[in-house]
Amino acid sequence: MNLVVYLIQLFLAALLHLSAVKAAHIPKEGGKSKNDVIPFMDVYKKSACKTRELLVDIIQEYPDEIEHTYIPSCVVLMRCAGCCNDEALECVPTETRNVTMEVLRVKQRVSQHNFQLSFTEHTKCECRPKAEVKAKKENHCEPCSERRKRLYVQDPLTCKCSCKFTQMQCKSRQLELNERTCRCEKPR
């Protein structure tokens, strides 16, 4: 009896997966022949940064769940995708929401049952500077000293270098701060 229920659930899951694949397919508009040229504005609008239905692998969202198999193995989620007008920008979510979906969770030869998983869906998208571009702009200062980096702190806005140790820290050890070398030294 359990095998029959499992086979029915497997069939329904496969059917759901196939319908999701069909829904994710972008159909040709108006029965155009394969030699028609798609106008620029159509191409531009379809490629813009926006939320779209995407198939997302469950294991991608839950990488630590390797001892289980999920049916279906992927789900349809609204996610940000598309192109930005500048290569330094990327399409990223600005608003999200959680959605809970019921899937079949199978542990090989042990158990199977319906299981609820929570996923993040994107509701709004924007083109924003890529993370590596931000990092390059933020770190525009030359290092204080190649040989003694650990002795200095640097103001990221002004790039001004100052000693990591303070006069008070040096005095607490009966030493004086040498501001040229940024080291605590014995008084002369």
Swiss-Prot record:
PROSITE patterns: PDGF_1 (PS00249), PDGF_2 (PS50278). Keywords: Angiogenesis, Developmental protein, Differentiation, Disulfide bond, Glycoprotein, Growth factor, Mitogen, Secreted, Signal. Residues 1-23 form the signal peptide. Predominantly expressed in regions associated with active vascularization. From 15-16 hours post-fertilization (hpf), expressed in the anterior forebrain, the mesoderm underlying and lateral to the anterior hindbrain, the mesoderm underlying and lateral to the posterior hindbrain, and in the ventral medial portions of the somites. By 30-36 hpf, expression in the somites is decreased, while strong expression is observed in the region of the developing glomeruli and in the anterior portion of the pronephric ducts, the pharyngeal arches, and the brain. Disulfide bonds join C49-C91, C80-C125, C84-C127. One of its GO terms (cellular component) is membrane. Growth factor active in angiogenesis, vasculogenesis and endothelial cell growth. Induces endothelial cell proliferation, promotes cell migration, inhibits apoptosis, and induces permeabilization of blood vessels. Required for intersegmental vessel development in the tail during embryogenesis. Acts both upstream of kdr and tie1 to stimulate endothelial cell differentiation, and upstream of gata1 to stimulate hematopoietic cell differentiation. This is Vascular endothelial growth factor A-A. It comes from Danio rerio. The lineage of its organism: Eukaryota, Metazoa, Chordata, Craniata, Vertebrata.
